[in-house]
Regions:
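Active-site-adjacent loops and short helices of periplasmic peptidoglycan-processing enzymes
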Residues: 24-177, 181-190, 195
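Sec-dependent N-terminal signal peptides of Gram-positive bacterial secreted proteins and lipoproteins
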Residues: 4-25, 413-425
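C-terminal non-catalytic accessory extensions
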Residues: 443-446
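Domain-terminus/edge residues, biased toward the C-terminal soluble/receptor-binding domains
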Residues: 156-160, 170-173, 177-437, 449-452
Length: 453
């Protein structure tokens, strides 16, 4: 169900704190026509392009990404199953806009969780959101609370949800960056991409409806409605539009080893001079993807077999130990930038390092940066064992013993006692000496010699 994506060779700033902005180094700005836009390296989380990424904006039906996330989370936890059948209630169908996106699900109609997810993500059916919300949390209101709790858990700081479907409300907003965080979490579930990357699907007949043929609202992956935006590299994810939100799109694309996630919010729908109607969310997303693919590539900037530093060693007859990177480091860089342009900053855990040293022991880190922006960080490991000298270790231990505060205090006390003892001997020794001399004189004065008869 849930794919755990471990990054073994990519060590970008996403592993340090927050995210990094890849230096554009004289790249031409794509000037994306949207209120907010974001292009992120899907493998590492490094930001390739950003425009107003933290601005609070209306997401429209991009909201449904969070609804899908919470539904799939409930499936993983065993609270629901994809083949579980749900009955559409009157409460789930009430209060929805008559001209909003819909799969025409009727009250009392029975449909599986999986097919409701298809209705929600493929044709953006608003009623499917509320049906799933009731199944997951018991009520739409409780589900909205769960949406906001999940947003906080994911680190979203500019998001507040009011409903599960994205129908307009002035208090229902998010940001391009927060949508990226939500989408990234949803992509951990294989079923999410399987469903949202569906161009068209036939939903089997239900108790109240004939079979439904659904065609996606995402023109990047299906040209059934408009072929002008098809992108063979694109996969999913979700469209959204209202008069207040404009046209919005979250999408992903992969070409070779490159993989991007994009978010555009607040795009317009333009009528060109030749009468062509251009939906800018699709058009600008394609421009953003092409800009990323054309201008960036992965480059190996550090290899595990290089030895960038010798570290002094104490307590050993061996004076130095070499260190090497823990692994190769491959990062996304502008094509005009090379590994030699990066600044290497080596920080050692100790210099000198005390023996014994074990091969593979971490002795420091190396940070790679450009123009003050961090690209990557990699651990530096000892390349060989270094044995400790018994004699040098013994003298070190002796010094450490006498450097201990308790030993120093005891030493001072002993020194004071010795001084006091010497003073005592000096003072009382003189008194005894004087006393002895005075007694001797007295005896000598009373002696008159032997009497002779």
């Amino acid at each position: 169900m849930k794919t755990r994506r471990f990054l073994s060779v990519f060590l970008l700033l996403a592993l340090l704190a927050g995210f990094c902005m890849i230096p554009a180094q004289a790249l031409e700005d794509p000037d994306i026509q949207a209120k907010a836009a974001l292009l992120v390296d899907a493998n590492t989380g490094a930001v390739v392009y950003a425009k107003n990424e933290h601005q609070e904006l209306y997401p429209a039906s991009l909201t449904k990404i969070m609804t899908a996330l919470l539904t799939l989370e409930a499936v993983e936890e065993g609270r629901l199953s994809l083949d579980q059948e749900l009955t559409a209630t009157e409460s789930a169908l009430s209060g929805l806009s008559a001209d909003g996106s819909s799969a025409n699900i009727k009250a009392g109609e029975i449909m599986s969780v999986e097919n409701l997810l298809y209705c929600m993500m493929v044709v953006s059916a608003n009623e499917a959101c509320d049906i799933l919300a009731e199944a997951v949390s018991g009520s739409v209101d409780a589900f909205v609370d769960a949406m906001n709790d999940k947003a906080k858990e994911l680190g979203c700081t500019n998001t507040h949800f009011v409903n599960p479907n994205g129908l307009h409300d002035s208090q229902h907003y998010t940001s391009a960056w927060d949508l990226y965080l939500i989408t990234k979490a949803a992509l951990e579930y294989d079923d999410f991409m399987r469903i949202c990357d569906t161009g068209s699907i036939t939903i089997p007949a239900t108790n109240l409806s004939q079979e439904r043929v659904l065609h996606t609202t995402n023109y990047l992956i299906n040209g059934w409605r408009s072929r002008g935006y098809i992108n063979k590299d694109a996969h999913g994810i979700k469209t959204g539009s209202t008069s207040d939100a404009g046209h919005c799109l979250v999408s992903s694309a992969q070409r070779g080893s490159l993989s991007f996630l994009s978010v555009v919010l607040g795009c317009e729908r333009l009528t060109l001079e030749d009468g062509e109607i251009r939906t800018m969310s699709f058009y600008e997303t394609n421009r953003l993807f092409n800009w990323g693919f054309d201008n960036f590539s992965y480059k190996t900037v550090v290899t595990a077999d290089e030895y960038p530093k010798e570290v002094p060693v104490s307590l050993s007859k061996t004076e130095h130990v070499t260190v090497h990177p823990a692994q190769d480091v491959e990062i996304l860089m502008p094509n005009g930038l090379s590994a030699g342009d990066l600044v290497r900053d080596i920080q050692l855990t100790g210099s000198p390092v005390e023996a014994p040293v074990s091969k593979g022991q971490k002795l420091g880190t190396m940070t790679l940066s450009y123009n003050g922006k961090t690209y990557a960080q990699v651990d530096l490991l000892a390349s060989n064992d270094v044995d400790a000298s018994k004699l040098l270790t013994f003298w070190r231990d002796v010094k450490l013993f006498f450097a201990r505060p308790v030993v120093k205090i005891v030493g001072v006390i002993l020194l004071v006692l010795v001084v006091l003892l010497l003073l005592w001997k000096l003072v009382f020794g003189r008194r005894r000496y004087r006393y002895g001399r005075s007694v001797g004189r007295g005896r000598n004065q009373g002696y008159r010699g032997r009497r002779r008869f």
